[in-house]
Amino acid sequence: MTISAPPIIDIRQAGLESSIPDQVVEGLTKEVKTLPALLFYSTKGIQHWNRHSHAADFYPRHEELCILKAEASKMAASIAQDSLVIDMGSASMDKVILLLEALEEQKKSITYCALDLSYSELASNFQAIPVDRFHYVRFAALHGTFDDGLHWLQNAPDIRNRPRCILLFGLTIGNFSRDNAASFLRNIAQSALSTSPTQSSIIVSLDSCKLPTKILRAYTADGVVPFALASLSYANSLFHPKGDRKIFNEEDWYFHSEWNHALGRHEASLITQSKDIQLGAPLETVIVRRDEKIRFGCSYKYDKAERDQLFHSAGLEDAAVWTAPDCDVAFYQLRLRLN
């Protein structure tokens, strides 16, 4: 018997693609120019990112896999029966499948919901899951943003009283500034954990590595350049769907990677190849100077003091930690701080 892939539920509250151009204009007309993260996660962008994250030098994924292979059963044991497990940005399924298999082995009746911006990536990922092997774990897919996912958790009546386990794998929290990371976790805690605080949790991966050579090897590994440049093609298609004009000529740009010691973060930017660049309509008044950085991504690293501050500011406490020898990455189970 063939078991069909789970349905993909559209939980988007607003037109995502209609909002990205506004964010592009806002970011490129500031003194310190930026591009929004959403611009980098088109279907092509996600495919390039998956290739990059599978590169030999990209240690975060390899370390997460190492930990999950060793500790998935303990993670699964910490998740309450009848939980709704929400994967906030599912991307590649090869990591989370280890946790799902452990939940199945423990006969945990849970519903796994993968949240992603890309409909086609959700469909592709679920086609690769052997759902017929699972009898206790049920599957669903959610098409939307982080905010859409939190809104759905708060407002869908049939799931309101179930325990929740929010998965933030892939060093997702590191993509936010430290203040914004605390705000994001606090928002998740208030939206998703408060209905069943003693049984609900967040499982988040964080990276403590601050060794520049290791970090720069990882973040310049194979696949990152096409990932970065795919954003420019996507921007052109959003502003000029007919393809008759361009804001960016992709050949004018290259990817720039650096470690910011003072802020404890890796920074990813686009820089012009060799000259000042005038952007195309509707940003023809914007000149990007030679060697001026357009930053699009940061990956913050967390030592113990920074982790403690993050969790405290978010109103959370760590209930469990899972890591492995020689790994800088670790998974933290966070619960609402009740006192």
Curated annotation (Swiss-Prot):
GO terms for biological process: ergot alkaloid biosynthetic process; methylation. Pfam families: Methyltransf_33. Keywords: Alkaloid metabolism, Methyltransferase, S-adenosyl-L-methionine, Transferase. Signal peptide: none annotated. InterPro entries: EgtD_Methyltrsf_superfamily, MeTrfase_dom, MeTrfase_EgtD-like, SAM-dependent_MTases_sf, SAM_MeTrfase_EasF-type_put. One of its GO terms (molecular function) is methyltransferase activity. Coiled coil: none annotated. The keyword Methyltransferase applies. Pathway: Alkaloid biosynthesis; ergot alkaloid biosynthesis. It catalyses: 4-(3-methylbut-2-enyl)-L-tryptophan + S-adenosyl-L-methionine = 4-(3-methylbut-2-enyl)-L-abrine + S-adenosyl-L-homocysteine + H(+). Its EC number is 2.1.1.261. Methyltransferase that mediates the second step of biosynthesis of ergot alkaloid biosynthesis. Catalyzes the N-methylation of 4-dimethylallyl-L-tryptophan in the presence of S-adenosyl-L-methionine, resulting in the formation of 4-dimethylallyl-L-abrine. Ergot alkaloids, which are produced by endophyte fungi, can enhance plant host fitness, but also cause livestock toxicosis to host plants. Belongs to the methyltransferase superfamily. Homodimer. This is 4-dimethylallyltryptophan N-methyltransferase. It comes from Aspergillus fumigatus.
